[in-house]
Amino acid sequence: MRVDLNSDLGESFGRYKLGLDEEVMKYITSANVACGWHAGDPLVMRKTVRLAKENDVQVGAHPGYPDLMGFGRRYMKLTPEEARNYILYQVGALYAFAKAEGLELQHVKPHGALYNAMVKEEDLARAVIEGILDFDKDLILVTLSNSRVADIAEEMGLKVAHEVFADRAYNPDGTLVPRGRPGAVIEDKEEIAERVISMVKDGGIRAINGEWVDLKVDTICVHGDNPKAVEITSYIRKVLEEEGVKIVPMKEFIR
């Protein structure tokens, strides 16, 4: 059994410092690097790509809405043309830094409100996927496990990594409980580890109301901006490996 560990990194910009990138990078296999619109800047992007290279971590683009003030967590209504070109612009920007460091991009994982909106809006999902295909048909789309987005991407010829979240509660329909609601974010590492093992070994998790939710797991997201990120990430990796799960980059098993 193989699984990828990913984290959203490179989300500092200017004098604003966010996340524990250097420490978290030691335990993950894939880094989702902010592309300057919801977070990140050219200096941070280059630094994060270089850090990934030093730790033998695969690099992926983490594009979002043009929303620095809201950290990309506020919904924006986009036309398909806007969405397609916003993705192409951001992925291309990160690719420049990857190429400068002698790396290729492995994947694309949309950020925040854009990620969630794609699950609800098929036209938006198609436009984002078209933007990725415009750039490189061999990239992997990281999206919500068992979502319609995954089906659409595969229908359009794009490889997919089904993603689950280690520290987030789920609704019965397989979507994430919004961050502002009680119980949405889980902070206890023991509980997080138990949930991750359930996802990987049992193929699902109990939703916030107790119902069972089936989940396919290719990659597990651990958030790098959590104050306990290093403790949680290292513990998740340790527990998974003790259960006989191999932690490897998604490109090694998603073809």
Curated annotation (Swiss-Prot):
Coiled coil: none
Source organism of the structure: Pyrococcus horikoshii (strain ATCC 700860 / DSM 12428 / JCM 9974 / NBRC 100139 / OT-3)
Encoding gene per record: pxpA
EC number: 3.5.2.9
PANTHER family: 5-OXOPROLINASE SUBUNIT A (PTHR30292:SF0), UNCHARACTERIZED PROTEIN YBGL-RELATED (PTHR30292)
Task performed by this protein: Catalyzes the cleavage of 5-oxoproline to form L-glutamate coupled to the hydrolysis of ATP to ADP and inorganic phosphate.
Swiss-Prot/TrEMBL catalytic activity: 5-oxo-L-proline + ATP + 2 H2O = L-glutamate + ADP + phosphate + H(+)
Family as reported in the entry's similarity comment: Belongs to the LamB/PxpA family.
Gene Ontology biological process: carbohydrate metabolic process
EC category: hydrolase
HAMAP family: PxpA
Keywords from the named record: ATP-binding, Hydrolase, Nucleotide-binding
InterPro entries, A to Z: Glyco_hydro/deAcase_b/a-brl (IPR011330), LamB/YcsF/PxpA-like (IPR005501)
Name by which UniProt lists this protein: 5-oxoprolinase subunit A
